[in-house]
Amino acid sequence: MKADNTIKDKSLDFAIRIVRLYKHISETNNEYILSKQLLKSGTSIGANVREAIGGQSKENFIAKMHIALKEAYETEYWLELLYSTDYLLSLIHISEPTRP
């Protein structure tokens, strides 16, 4: 696998943004249940991408990337729910990238 891996890099950046968002929500709104779900699914994406990269077979790679995709869908759900229940403001739920 190439050293320059866009999916690996973006999933790490996304996980960092999710951790920062979790800290913000839990410190500002004292909300822990929904934001914990967001933290778990949002950081799991990158973990599964890393596992896919180190996979033992093409089938293992595909399976792990599919899990990462499912975690991304779940993360999208938690973000929408937090936004719809006013734990996230419109300006907050569109966060800035962690790297240029």
Range-by-range predicted roles:
Residues 21-25, 51, 82-91:
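Short, solvent-exposed, charged loop/turn and helix-capping segments
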Residues 48-65:
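Acidic/His metal-coordination segments adjacent to aromatic residues that form catalytic metal sites
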Residues 60-89:
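Mid-chain, well-packed structural core segment of small domains
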Residues 92-98:
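Conserved small/polar residues in nucleotide/adenosyl-binding loops
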